[in-house]
Amino acid sequence: MAAVAPAGPGDSASAALDELSLNFTYGAPGAGNGSLSGDWYRRNQIHLFGVLLAILGNLVISISLNIQKYSHLQLAQQEHPRPYFKSVLWWGGVLLMAVGETGNFAAYGFAPITLIAPLGCVSVTGSAIISVTFLKDNLRASDLLGTTLAFAGTYLLVNFAPNITQAISARTVQYYLVGWQFLIYVILEILIFCILLYFYKRKGMKHMVILLTLVAILASLTVISVKAVSGMITFSVMDKMQLTYPIFYIMFIIMIASCVFQVKFLNQATKLYNTTTVVPVNHIFFTISAIIAGIIFYQEFLGAPFLTVFIYLFGCFLSFLGVFLVTRNREKEHLQQSYIDFGNIPGKQMLDKIQPDSHSLSYGTLPDGSDSTKSQSGEKKEV
């Protein structure tokens, strides 16, 4: 069924409901049942284009995160470390992230949130490979198994996501925005965000879960606003101009603001923790947040068969399990500093250990719990 705008002002609530009912188009029975026939491809060409944009965008994002991490490592090893925002390399990573996010945002205009959001698992694989290549992380057997499970989950997600085409107009967004489901949802998000922000700012708690939960809460607003903005632009091109409605610019401002603060918290996480841990955990949190946002705000599972929903959730489970296998037992990154250990010289007694002082060009002793009187002069102890 094609999307039809209400003819007159009349009863606005009733008109909005009528428009919503016309804005949903589900595939025929059997469509979206996992079959990869030629008919399936023809029916889902627009969705597949969105999937391609999302995959490419996530690969670029994984590259950008590793570049930012490499920038932090370089700055930390300098004699006089500079702020990260003065690093050209760091800004290059931010620019790449913007490109990747642009591809992701565009993807939401061609496919449902519940289809695009879980595809962030592609960045897990990309991040692991890039970290092994450039940051010298170890590639383990569990990484390969996790990657395989992530791809299996992606296959199920693409084939069993709701086969829905939804026309997003300004009236539709306005109706969703004042719905009781979304109002309850956004109030809960604001409360959780304020509590976490209090612990982060006032208590100095910078645990990765706190940082990435803040990112995920902002991300839910991002995907809602991105879907609204891109949907209204598409509706303007295909049907009736929507850019004259104030709601378009309200959603645009929400999109920009939420993106800016996401970058702030995500950058803090990548500075403190290994990207091979940050990226996958961020994927899990973001995916859950985005799926909930799509279900509550855009009602993307409305009328979907139970089997489709079950297999879709199973695909999410496989994706998350793959992410867990990739991230488990990852040690926090430590800066590699050169030091000399006299005890490692064959036939020599251990006299002392010395290493470069991280903040000067001089040499000093490594701390030793058995002797708290070591001097920075490197003098030998009597044996």
UniProtKB/Swiss-Prot annotation:
Instruction: Give compartment(s).
Output: Membrane
Glycan-linked positions:
23, 33, 274
Q: Which Pfam families match?
A: Mg_trans_NIPA (PF05653)
- Origin, by domain of life? Eukaryota
Is-annotated flag, keyword Transmembrane helix?
A: yes
List the InterPro entries: Mg_trans_NIPA
Transmembrane stretches in the record are 46-66, 88-108, 110-130, 144-164, 177-197, 209-229, 243-263, 278-298, 306-326
Disordered: region residues: 355-383
Query: What topology does it adopt in the membrane?
Result: Multi-pass membrane protein
Keyword list, A-Z = Glycoprotein, Membrane, Transmembrane, Transmembrane helix
Predominantly, its location class is membrane
An example molecular function term from Gene Ontology annotations: magnesium ion transmembrane transporter activity
GO terms for biological process, alphabetical: magnesium ion transport
Gene Ontology cellular-component terms listed: membrane
Q: Which family does it belong to?
A: Belongs to the NIPA family.
Q: What name does the UniProt record give this protein?
A: NIPA-like protein 2
Query: From what organism does this protein derive?
Result: Homo sapiens
